[in-house]
């Protein structure tokens, strides 16, 4: 039993970072996960929630400050404030160091291997004005807002500093909104705007034009697209580099969305090659079919990966970019059964990537490359790109 109650304020020494963006502290040998703190600090922590084994809290007063602490650029980034950013009080360089620690820890604990990955920063290097997709809640007062951490409480805002400039200059922040339906805002690489509510465009264009590495994608606002304005280009570069694609290769693009990776790969494999895009989302599939309607070396499969992959034969390279919970054992086993010469895995969660990496290593695949990309500055989230090749029996 925990001897803490919600609302208690305790003084704690702040320990190491944990997966999920909290820092670990202890009170009478009981673990407390703390937000708004940094390793090495001493803080007064207000307990915000409790479960059977753990307590969670916010550092509401810093008694001993870390040299890595900075003033949060956003006025809403504070205990009890907006829950979107959890690293605004930490310098950019240290944010990346913490993300490296998180990746290393997950691979040590789950995959049982030691790694030393680079975590690279991405323009804009200030960590602000990078987010091209933003969902806004509506408060009881009819104002735009974002949710407090793990809460239904809406924190009213008139700007979001991690959002791109066009979102912040939009009129949506200055209007009164009726009802509870959320607003979804999107800005393309071509600076086109869409504001969507209840599935309908209420401001801007119905479709957005994205240009990535000389490939053009016309996408609907409900289709998945990377949030960081510069993420698509960087991810394409890393995936192409690690996959080592050649003319005539046969490739699978799993969880392929609208075809971010399919478009450049189709050019590299040429008419003698073939790429299979598998995606279950209706909006993404609709967009992908339009984008690639005249491409004979692209085959689109609408459905779950675990149902479609088994039917595709003679695949040499597999690219996968699954949701946060990863591909999982069933899909990874299907990938292994295909015996691809190389696998490139894009992941937004180090824990699920480490879990799936363990399965691949146990089945004769070698982890050759792993890099962290800081595509979510001011938050604990980090994108990873990993590549694997099948070990050759001697």
Question: Residue spans of the language-model regions?
Answer:
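Broad, structure-driven detector of short, well-ordered beta-strand segments within folded domains
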Residues: 45, 136-138, 181-193
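Rossmann-like S-adenosyl-L-methionine
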Residues: 2-13, 19-20, 177-179, 188-394
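Extended interfacial segments that mediate partner engagement and assembly in macromolecular machines
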Residues: 60-75, 79-180
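Terminal RNA-binding accessory module
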Residues: 1-78, 151
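Residue-level signal for inorganic ion chemistry
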Residues: 25, 40, 85, 349, ...
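Short, surface-exposed beta-strand-loop junctions and turns on beta-sheet-rich folds
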Residues: 30-33, 151-154, 200-202, 225
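Short acidic-glycine loop/turn motifs at beta-strand connectors
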Residues: 28, 51, 138-143, 149-151, ...
């Amino acid at each position: 039993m925990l001897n803490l109650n919600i609302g208690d304020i305790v003084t704690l020494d702040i320990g190491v970072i944990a997966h999920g963006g909290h820092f670990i502290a202890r009170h009478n040998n009981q673990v407390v996960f703390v937000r708004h703190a940094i390793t090495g600090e001493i803080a007064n922590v207000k307990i915000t929630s409790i479960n059977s084994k753990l307590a969670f809290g916010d550092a509401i007063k810093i008694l001993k400050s870390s040299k890595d602490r900075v003033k949060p650029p956003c006025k809403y980034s504070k205990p009890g404030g907006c829950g979107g950013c959890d690293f605004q009080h930490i310098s950019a360089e240290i944010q990346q160091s913490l993300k490296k620690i998180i990746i290393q820890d997950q691979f040590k604990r789950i995959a049982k291997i030691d790694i030393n990955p680079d975590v690279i920063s991405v323009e804009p290097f200030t960590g602000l004005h990078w987010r091209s997709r933003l969902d806004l809640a509506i408060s009881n007062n009819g104002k735009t807002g974002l949710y407090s951490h793990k809460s239904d409480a809406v924190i009213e805002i008139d700007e979001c500093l991690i959002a791109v400039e066009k979102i912040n200059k939009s009129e949506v922040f200055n209007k009164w909104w009726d009802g509870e339906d959320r607003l979804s805002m999107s800005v393309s690489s071509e600076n086109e705007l869409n504001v969507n509510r209840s599935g309908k465009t209420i401001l801007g264009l119905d479709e957005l034009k994205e240009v990535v590495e000389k490939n053009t994608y016309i996408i609907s606002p409900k289709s998945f697209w990377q949030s960081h304005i510069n993420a698509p280009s960087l991810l394409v570069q890393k995936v192409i580099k690690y996959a080592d694609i050649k003319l005539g290769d046969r490739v699978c693009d799993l969880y392929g969305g609208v075809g971010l990776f399919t478009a450049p790969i189709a050019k590299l494999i040429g008419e003698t090659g073939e790429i299979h895009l598998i995606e279950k989302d209706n909006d993404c599939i609709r967009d992908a079919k339009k984008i690639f309607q005249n491409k004979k070396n692209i085959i689109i499969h609408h459905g779950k990966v675990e149902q479609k992959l088994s039917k595709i034969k003679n695949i040499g390279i597999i690219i996968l970019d699954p949701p946060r919970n990863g591909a999982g054992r069933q899909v990874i086993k299907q990938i292994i059964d295909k015996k691809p010469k190389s696998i490139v895995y894009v992941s937004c969660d180090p824990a699920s990537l480490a879990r799936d990496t363990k399965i691949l290593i146990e089945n004769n695949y070698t982890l050759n490359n792993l890099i962290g990309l800081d595509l979510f500055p001011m938050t604990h989230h980090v994108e990873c790109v990993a590549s694997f090749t099948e070990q050759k029996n001697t």
